[in-house]
């Protein structure tokens, strides 16, 4: 039997994961300028995202420019774009499928496949979380590698942006939501319920003797025993 509370918690986490993934995908702060070494005093700070890069001047003015070409971007940026878009689409599909399979909805209430639909929604959430976690972790690894590398100039080093933190949290929310939805349905509990219903059906339909009327088998035995001794 599906746990309604576990499904509700999983669905809310899935929605939060989807919202955070979309915001992290659009934010231009995956990488921010690092103020170390000779770059401590600088008039312009840069931040880069998947779709645009921004320059923040010392006067407080921020200018953002969308990338003029997508094919000219590095391969890791293109892969991150594709994975984040696919993750958002997968999580959106998971939200729709999970609504159909949740116990608190009116869809397929008498169908045995309702719990299976919820499990499918949970699998979509897990796939969406994995697709969102891979590009975030890859960019995080690249930032840390370049930051601690002595071969990279200080002016070319970046720090972790807010979008990466949001992406990690959102992907974890999607993964936890998928696990909750998958484990909220117990196949053993469903089999036992159907078995009990099947066993109880002939007992409920069995006719009971009327008041004052002896059972049929007992009356036949009594008549046989009386006639046998006459």
From Swiss-Prot:
Signal peptide: none annotated. It catalyses: Na(+)(in) = Na(+)(out); K(+)(in) = K(+)(out); Rb(+)(in) = Rb(+)(out); Li(+)(in) = Li(+)(out). The gene is CLDN2. Disulfide bonds join 54-64. Residues 229-230 are annotated as: Interaction with TJP1, TJP2 and TJP3. This is Claudin-2. Keywords: Cell junction, Cell membrane, Disulfide bond, Isopeptide bond, Membrane, Phosphoprotein, Tight junction, Transmembrane, Transmembrane helix, Ubl conjugation. It is found in: Cell junction, Tight junction; Cell membrane. There is a cross-link at residue 218 (Glycyl lysine isopeptide (Lys-Gly) (interchain with G-Cter in SUMO)). Belongs to the claudin family. It is a multi-pass membrane protein. The modification Phosphoserine is found at residues 219, 223. It comes from the Eukaryota. The record marks 65 as: Paracellular cation selectivity. Residues 29-81, 138-162 are extracellular. Pfam families: PMP22_Claudin. It comes from Bos taurus (Bovine).
